């Protein structure tokens, strides 16, 4: 077998898609059947403008919260907690038993810990020196 290893700083879409589809096909052999559902929970002001919310993926018994954001004028008013509580309330009847997420050291680790999340992992000095990335989960 005559194989050649390559490296690039300019990844092309064709190579990316080949790798992505390959790992997805492999994963599908080991994961239960089911569709990943995109979910969201939002906060709107009096004018109906979106001022915050969360987005994530629901798959079988789990939710991964990808993003939680509030406009800076609406922070420190309990809205983040309300969003997370609403998420739990809505997904638990769907059979969800665990919520997972990640956060950086400059974001909201203490917030999630106060909500009952448990830190289950950490990258140090990622994505830059002096910044950590934390992985959390909460069994509901």
Residue ranges with predicted function:
Residues 76-89, 114:
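Conserved acetyl-CoA-binding loop-helix of GNAT-fold acetyltransferases
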Residues 19, 112, 117:
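Conserved active-site tyrosine of GNAT-family acetyltransferases
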Residues 64, 95-97, 116:
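Short loop/turn motifs at secondary-structure junctions
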Residues 60-62, 98, 133:
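A generic structural signal for beta-strand entry/edge sites
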Residues 100-102, 118-135:
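Conserved catalytic-core motifs of GNAT/GCN5-like acyltransferases
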Residues 91-104:
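Conserved GNAT acetyl-CoA-binding A-motif
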Residues 3-66, 71, 106, 123-125, ...:
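Acetyl-CoA-dependent GNAT
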